[in-house]
Amino acid sequence: SCMAQKLKALENEVRNTFGSNCTIQTGAAGTSLALTIPYARTGLELKKEARMHGMSLLILEENAATITILLSCSSITTDDFAPACQLLSRLLNK
């Protein structure tokens, strides 16, 4: 399906951007993925910064060392996968 290809493209982009220090889980519906990545600050800060760049983030889980973010194929167009991942990477590594 078109959505499956889109999800694969998103997953590849996330892997290219974040490398081996991230965990990716595909959502049950096959339209989204959960990205777990080391992050020391609060999810609220991340959401605020992302919003300033026009990106709305859905945070699934937060603990002391990592954060899990939901990335949805339906809310990001394929052309935007790379810029979205780059932006996220910049925000996470601030």
Question: Residues of each region from the PLM?
Answer:
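Conserved glycine-rich beta-strand-loop-beta hairpin in the small C-terminal domain of fold type I
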Residues: 3-11, 22-36
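Residue-level preference for nonpolar/small residues embedded in alpha-helices
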Residues: 6, 41-42
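Conserved PLP-binding active-site segment of the aspartate aminotransferase-like
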Residues: 34-39, 56-91
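A short, small/polar-residue-rich loop/turn motif at beta-strand boundaries
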Residues: 43-48
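Conserved dinucleotide-binding and phosphotransfer motif residues
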Residues: 53
